[in-house]
């Protein structure tokens, strides 16, 4: 079981991720609605794994990832984004993202990623 922070501006996406991950036995410690909120909640809750959307208001996922990795070089962040954003995914990997997944994704795809990262 992993302690997870979900960062996504879409309420629907957060709800779907919560359902999938809780259904797999993981604990959602917090949800954040933008990158800045995500950085703050990362510091507050110290999750084992973060799922992070890339395109968000106030602070996008790439900037939030950069901030989180500056605070914790071992942070395990899975970037979640829409199809057609391959360049941003490459940027995310360069910034230290542990994994990435493209929407829509299969539930077992994200649960396997979270499980692998939680064990590492």
Go through each PLM region and give its residues.
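Short, conserved "switch-loop" micro-motifs in signal-transduction and mechanochemical regulators
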Residues: 83-84
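Two-component/phosphorelay signaling modules centered on CheY-like receiver
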Residues: 11-30
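Receiver (REC) domain active-site loop signature in two-component systems and cognate sites
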Residues: 56
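Active-site beta3 strand of CheY-like receiver
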Residues: 45-51
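Acidic catalytic/metal-coordinating carboxylates
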Residues: 34-37, 60-63
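C-terminal output helix
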Residues: 105-114
